[in-house]
Amino acid sequence: MRQVSSEEAFNTKLYPPMILGSILNPINSSMLAVALIPIAQAFGIPFYQTIWLVSSLYLATSIGQPVIGKLIDIFGPRGLFLFATSLVGVASLIAIFTPSFYGLVLARFLIGIGTCAGYPSAMYLISYEGKRTGKDSPSKILTMLSISNQMISVIGPTIGGLLIHSGGWQSIFLVNIPLSILSFVFGFLYYPKVESPKKLNALKEQIDFIGITLFTITLTTWMIFFMEPDQSIFYLFIIGLFCLLVFVIVELKSKKPFIDLRVLGHNGALNNTYIRSLLTAVISYSVLYGYVQWLEEGRGLTAAHAGLMMLPQFLVGIFMAQLTGTRLSIKFKLYLGTICALITMIGFQFIHADTPLWILVLLAAIFGVPQGLLNLANQNALYHQAPKSMIGMSAGLSRTAMYIGAIVSSTLISTLFKGDHITNGIHELGLFCMLIGIVIIILTFVSRRSLSTR
């Protein structure tokens, strides 16, 4: 059998920094799920207010992902990856030692910025290695990235619960420090130095600062309004709507837009993938934060026990990702995953404070199927549909869509879980997610021809 030379094969030394960088976001998302109640108790605030810790990270990432993705397309991934992973470690130290809740919110925002480079860097390097080797078959590394992300996303609550049980809520931030150091070291050693003709003094020509500002104002004002909806702050909704309209006009006229609406307008399949990614995220994060909070507050479990209850979801998710990674078509993954998500949401309609634990474990296990399939399917679709010259920005926009979905989810949870009726809240959250699941199936059917690949 002919030996494959190093020039023909994907550089496997890139695997550790690519995987470590990509898991920084899911580990900071998933472990927090079981920490919200302990943090609320520690700072003496209502538990629904801790959703700001969720929203602040996703506000940062929804803005930072496309910006850093574009910077990576221009300057290469190495410097940005090293800076971003260092920021995660520094921000985690702030989180551990801050005396105030809003200091913790700020730390989460900085952590969000720090996690923005991992995924666009990985997608850039996959494309870079494809050009270097002359091969364009990234299914193996894409599956590895998806499995590692799914593994962390689902095992995170279990690890977080055990850490909180032994060392308090601060311990979930302590984990970031060795991860940050390892990511920096591996990135420094193995990420290639990509020559770029661009100079820093041309940055203002490459980055749409006006578009970024308008996008930020829109997200921030709407997030504040919908998390605490009240007639007295309705003006925030109007400001957000106005900024959104101006944003669309500016982006259509800009030579280097923050979000290239013209490209999106001519790539219906990619648009469909972005919308599916957003809707998938609403369901996934509703389970991650809503279901776990209900297990603690509505079912009376400890953080450690609530985390352990999510372990079956991890096992099923990893199994499904490995089983179907290179076997099933993208559309079949989407259909199967969404149907299982709908079954879970139907189950949510019947859970109460005295529901047997085995039923709650079963619901978590069933949701492992969409957890293992949906993000993998959308990730594969993105790689095949995005222009190769814009893979970094396209990957960043995909993550932005997911993080906007997370913001929508956290806003829903904050609204529905207020007061003493958290069980009613989980029922209503399930109904909302059922409607979203139906929309995902419709979108998949509409784009079925472009989703026939693996």
Language-model features: locations:
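Extracellular/periplasmic helix-loop-helix junction of adjacent transmembrane segments
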Residues: A35-G64, G103
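Hydrophobic transmembrane-helix bundles of small-molecule transporters
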Residues: T143, H165-R276, I283
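Structural signal for membrane-spanning alpha-helices in multi-pass inner-membrane proteins
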Residues: A95, G187, W222-M223, F247-E251, ...
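Hydrophobic/small/kink-forming positions within alpha-helical transmembrane segments
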Residues: L59-I63, L93, Q150-V154, T158, ...
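Short, Lys/Arg-rich, polar N-terminal cytosolic tail immediately upstream
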Residues: M1-E8
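12-transmembrane solute porter fold
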Residues: F10-I27, L32-L36, F47, L53-S56, ...
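Helix-to-coil boundary motifs at intracellular loop junctions of multi-pass secondary transporters
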Residues: A42-F43, I74, L125-G134, S166, ...
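Helix-loop-helix hairpins in multi-pass membrane proteins, especially solute transporters
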Residues: D73-K204
